[in-house]
Amino acid sequence: MTTTANQGYVFATLEELEPAPTLAPGAPNDGRQRFDVRRRFEITSFGVQAFRAPEGVEVVREHTETLLGEDGQEELYIVMNGAATFEIDGETIEAPAGSLVQVRPAARRKATAKDDGTTILVVGGTPGKAYEPAPQEAADAFAAYNTGDFETALAKQRVVLEKRPNDAVAHFNAGCFAARAGLGDEAFDHLGRALQITERIKELVATDEDLD
């Protein structure tokens, strides 16, 4: 079905959306897909995206929302089809299609697809704070990174830093892209700046394969 738009609403099916870049350096190529629902509908008041994965693959990668501070996003996971096994702070939850799972920012979570094509919609926002969408160049940078074009990825990420000069994750990603592009000095500069902003970035630096 085609997308419909008028003054009061926008309609689209998830099947109409093209898979979007994975927003993590070094993410495994395991068939998981991300759909940028927020950007497709030009939503600016909250974050929303969807993930789809084959059986046995993590639909939701293991993470917390407080790695870089205590004001991370509160998230609601909606199992649209298929089924998933959630693991949240050591507890297991079986979530068939139609399930809603709300997770606090500090909780460590992941969800594994039990069926091929399991799809989860994720809605998130930081309690008590207005939502601030990431610059488009951040997604563009990862699109280039995922094709091996590290120079373009770095160029796009530099634009992100012009808009968010005090963003630790933005500096960290720029450091990863610079390292892949063979620009060691610039990589160290960005990583050093990220560590100045928050020492919590050490966990990412220690585990990221781009920085080996």
Which residue stretches match the model-derived regions?
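A short, N-terminal "cap"/entry segment at the start of jelly-roll beta-barrel domains
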Residues: 1-61
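Short, conserved beta-strand element in jelly-roll/cupin
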Residues: 68-86
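Short acidic-glycine-tyrosine-enriched beta hairpin
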Residues: 90-105
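Canonical tetratricopeptide repeat
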Residues: 173, 207-208
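Alpha-helical segment of the N-proximal tetratricopeptide repeat
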Residues: 131-163
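Ligand-binding loop in jelly-roll beta-barrel domains
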Residues: 105-130
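Start-of-helix register in tetratricopeptide repeats
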Residues: 135, 169, 203-204
